[in-house]
Amino acid sequence: DAVKAAGGGTLYLPAGRYLVDQPIKVPAGVELRGSWDVQHHTQSGGTALFTNYDGGATGESGASLIQLEAGAGIRGIMLAQLNIASDGFTAANPRKTPFMIQGQGPKVYIINVTIAVGDKGIDLASYDTSGHYVDYLGGVPLRAGIWVGGGAEGGFIRNMQLNPHYGSRLPEGGQGYPRVSMMRFVQSNCSALKFADVKNQTIFNNFVYGSVYGIHFLKDAITGKYPGKMTVIGHGSDGCTYSLFVEDADKDTKIVAINSELVNTQIPNEPVRSYVLMGDKVNTDKVHPNAKLVLYNSAFWGSPVFGAIINNGIVSFQQANFTRSGQGVDVRGGKAHVYTSYFAQRMGRAATGDDGYAKLGEQGKSIELTNNYYVSGFRFSKAGTGLIYGSDKK
């Protein structure tokens, strides 16, 4: 408040560990700044805010620990939830808390911030944070990474990395940081990146390791609007159950992903995994038949059960590399187009119900397969009256 009263500026916290057990509001025009000028890891130490704050009587719906008013920012700081897995809570059942950081107006920014461990990361969905800027976030949020919506326009999410090893690779001697191994939990409980009602959003060069949904598009809980047109460049989801999930989309939704790396790993308690999931069930009314997802120059690898599950809408793949495709591009509803792509998984016999590089289900409308290469030859299976067509179908 003193910095605000002086006309705004920077409140600098030198390297060290600070205990903060009550929410902090950073006023408009003020930056809360720590010792780091670059992205950093838990094991590097520096300026850190430790907390036991869990929302108090209102729990996870309580106020965020760090609240950024319009034009405020936080930079160069580590955050750590000390009691995430203590006092009756464990790595298998961690404590639920509010988001650690919340933007409460336009032009908020979060730069070079690391969440050593926390339940939820950054809330940019509860308010209109148009012009928000997030750059070089790292850490291991357990249930939510960055959630964006609220009608925000012209925001940037760039160069972030979420990975469970932030919770287990600590500075020399530990220095009071909680040591937690959260891989299995985040793979079954975390939604790392959520985008709802946003416009002209820049989503660039981000990486998520370990999550149910690596990047997730859905209807906005505040405005009731759907994702619009947006472009995602250089996104990576690794170790995920569903690397990219479109849960809600209307007729104007068009999501274009360029140079994506979408990876599944074999997760014992997640029996169904796919690189892409379009809609949560066959012919879901949450995804409009004309909603579009377009992927250019994608790398798919790992241990999928299905290469893609398409329940509604229109999904297009151009120049995709399916190192492994599982049971193929499974069009259960809606339409798919696959162009100039490479299916590298070898198959030992002719396609049956669960084999092949492409499947068209009983309620699937169509799949176009054109100019693709299949290492074991063109294999597909079809049920119902939908259409399989394209230059690959002789």
PLM features: residue spans?
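Amphipathic alpha-helical repeat scaffolds
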Residues: 1-3, 191-192
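A structural signal for beta-strand register positions
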Residues: 36, 78, 83, 114, ...
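Beta-strand repeat architectures
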Residues: 2-10, 361-367, 382-384, 391
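Short glycine/acidic-rich loop motifs that flank beta-strands on beta-rich extracellular proteins
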Residues: 21-23, 42-45, 54, 62, ...
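Detector for repetitive beta-architecture
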Residues: 8-10, 15-17, 23, 29-31, ...
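Extracellular beta-strand-rich, repetitive "passenger/adhesive" scaffolds
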Residues: 8-17, 35-47, 72, 77, ...
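Extracellular beta-strand-rich solenoid/capping regions of secreted or surface-exposed proteins
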Residues: 4-6, 18-33, 39-76, 80-108, ...
